[in-house]
Amino acid sequence: MSDQERETEEDEGGDPSDTAPMLPQRLPDHQASDLMSPGWASLAARGLGTLLFQGWALARLLLHLLLPAAVFLLVLLPAAAVVYLGFLCHSRVHPAPRPACRALLSDRGSAAVIVLGFLSLPPLLVLASAARARLARRLHSLLPPPTWSPGPHRQSDGEKQLCAWV
């Protein structure tokens, strides 16, 4: 820009920044290499570590929730199926039961199947609890114990303190 053009611009109230390039200039090579310095790598590693830690915590939470649900569902499914079959074939639930139900079960038979299904629930609950405890013991590294447990606690001086619930 010549001196005369600058004077004209200043007279018109133009700012020299109006003629500045809109895009930033390319970084020199030594500044571009700063982006790949060990500081950036450690920052990226810390960020990745934080994401992995939160992902691991989420996986443990899902395992805590889904493991008992899956075990109890699988173990209690036969009892639920028997109860459903009993209700499906009973004439008071369905006024006109299917011919296959009539051939297999009368109303008394359907009631007996319903009672059998409900009576099989407690032993199956015990079996499901035992299976869940065994799986939790095997997966102990993935399922750490809870941080708080009720019962007597040791004080720092070795005395026992009993927590009473009111």
Swiss-Prot record:
Compositional bias, Acidic residues, is annotated for 1-15
Looking up InterPro entries in the UniProt record yields: TMEM88
Could you tell me the superkingdom of the organism this chain comes from?
Eukaryota
| GO biological process, alphabetically ordered | negative regulation of canonical Wnt signaling pathway
> Which membrane topology term applies here?
Multi-pass membrane protein
Quick one: where's region Disordered?
Answer: 1-28
Membrane spanning segments where? 39-59, 65-85, 111-131
- UniProt keyword Membrane, yes or no: yes
In the UniProt record, does the keyword Metal-binding occur? no
Could you tell me the keywords of this UniProt record? Answer: Membrane, Transmembrane, Transmembrane helix
| Chief subcellular location | membrane
Compartments it resides in: Membrane
Q: Identify one Gene Ontology CC term for this UniProt entry.
A: plasma membrane
Family of this protein: Belongs to the TMEM88 family.
Name of this protein:
Transmembrane protein 278
Origin species, per record, is Bos taurus
